[in-house]
Amino acid sequence: MEKDDLTHFNDEKRAKMVDVTSKSETKRRAIARATIHMNEETLARIHAGKIAKGDVLAVAQVAGIMAAKKTSELIPMCHPIMTTKADISFEDDGKTALTITSEVVTVGKTGVEMEALTAVTIAALTIYDMCKAMDKGMRIEKTYLVEKTGGKSGTFKAEA
């Protein structure tokens, strides 16, 4: 795509929301991932339910789902989307890294990549917020789109 082909700009080169009126509705799915690194003790306390603010993973899961649904309110040019599925899962390395994965699905005229990315980002920020009293050095890293399907551009899979 050439610079002149960018669709978020009008004839005056000012920002606009892309017109998706004539696009066909298709099933669209996106998976995103982010990793938060923390002290070993922090991860152990999360799993043991010993964080003063409550069940960290349950709250982060709900925050991620809510974020997917609110993406168009946070990112100016994102279309409001009827989200038909939003799921958040967690996997850790048993030491210091917790990986957050989101899956977002819709049937619509535009994709859900931004919703999936927003979901993992907000879930990671929620974990940071709930654990910062004991571990201010946590790092949120490697937030990326893993896969997207549907729509005119077809399937995308990140390189492993």
Curated annotation (Swiss-Prot):
Catalytic activity from the UniProt record = (8S)-3',8-cyclo-7,8-dihydroguanosine 5'-triphosphate = cyclic pyranopterin phosphate + diphosphate
Return the Gene3D superfamilies for the record: Molybdopterin cofactor biosynthesis C (MoaC) domain
Which residues does the annotation say bind substrate?
M77, C78, H79, M114, E115
Q: Where is the active site?
A: D129
> Which pathway does the database say it acts in?
Cofactor biosynthesis; molybdopterin biosynthesis
Under Enzyme Commission nomenclature, its number is: 4.6.1.17
Identify a single GO molecular function assigned to this protein.
Answer: cyclic pyranopterin monophosphate synthase activity
Q: How does it assemble?
A: Homohexamer; trimer of dimers.
Instruction: Give the family from UniProt.
Output: Belongs to the MoaC family.
Q: What is this protein called?
A: Cyclic pyranopterin monophosphate synthase
The species this protein belongs to is Listeria monocytogenes serotype 4b (strain CLIP80459)
Gene name for this UniProt entry: moaC
